[in-house]
A protein has these predicted regions:
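Structured alpha-helical segments in the cores of large, soluble enzyme domains
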Residues: 14-20, 132-140
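Short pre-catalytic strand/loop immediately N-terminal to key active-site residues, enriched for Gly-Thr
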Residues: 3, 124-132, 150-151, 221-224
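Glycine-/charge-enriched secondary-structure boundary and capping motifs
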Residues: 37-62, 69-74, 146, 152-257
């Protein structure tokens, strides 16, 4: 669906700015159209831009130009420029401080899209994944900033484990404990992993992350650690005293944190 593709690509691209705790200002579109009849290309481009412009407008961001190319598969991306009113600071965390990591969206878009490609995904799972990918991280970023966020990123193609690992390195801690049963998941994800379905990037993500004891879990739930996400949620580090209020604020605003 070119309209949804344009919308989700926008939300995905803007998320990098929100994860930096900044505000997006404008973007440039990069669109590749398959070689086909001009009327089909025109229709695809029109629907892509319609979805993208609506999502940009909702975020208060302008599309100021872009580039199109032809050949291969239909693809859409945006180069986004943002700004911050705060000067960058060096992150310093006491190694003995009690910290929590908050994830603002459920996981599983990678495995659901892989299953859908194989015609093995339930409609409810696909619908849940699409709704999740369309959901902007703007409000979650605002909540993070209101509750003394220490550091943040967003969960995208590298999967949760690698992004948690990178975040831990940024704040100077040796590692994190992830309770698999506490992770928010999209509909049907556990069943898909139990059926042996994984995304094409799954194995690569597993090799790239340093994770201990994940294979001791009694089910295949640990596979979600390496599932690549499209338009995934924000991941934030908080002091334990601030994390509870941040979680409550996210849940009150409809986030499946």
């Amino acid at each position: 669906d070119p309209f949804l593709l344009g919308e989700i690509a926008t939300v995905h691209a803007l998320s990098d700015i929100y994860a930096s705790l900044c505000r997006p200002l404008f973007s440039l579109a990069i669109i590749n159209l398959p070689e086909t009849e001009l009327s089909i290309q025109t229709n695809q481009l029109t629907h892509i831009l319609a979805g993208a412009l609506i999502a940009h407008s909702q975020a208060g961001v302008r599309v100021v130009g872009g580039h199109t190319s032809e050949g291969g598969n239909l693809s859409v991306g945006f180069a986004v420029t943002g700004s911050s009113t705060k000067l960058p600071s060096i992150i310093k965390v006491d190694k003995d401080e009690d910290l929590r990591i908050i994830l603002t969206k459920p996981l599983g878009t990678g495995v659901i899209m892989a299953a859908n490609w194989q015609l093995r995904a339930e409609a409810v799972s696909v619908d849940d994944a699409i709704a999740n990918m369309r959901h902007s991280n703007l409000q979650a970023a605002d909540i993070f900033m209101q509750h003394n966020i220490i550091a943040a990123t967003d969960v995208t193609g590298f999967g949760l484990a690698r992004h948690v690992q990178n975040l831990a390195m940024r704040v100077g801690i040796e590692g994190c404990i992830i309770d698999l049963t506490s992770l928010p998941l999209l509909s049907g994800v556990t069943s898909l992993f139990d059926a042996g379905i994984t995304s094409s990037l799954h194995e690569q993500n597993q090799l790239a992350a340093t994770v201990h004891d994940y294979d001791r879990h009694p089910s295949n739930l640990s596979a979600v650690l390496f599932d690549p996400q499209t338009s995934g949620g924000l991941l934030g580090v908080f002091a334990a005293k601030d994390a509870k209020n941040a979680i409550n604020a996210l849940i009150e605003t409809g986030h499946r944190a």
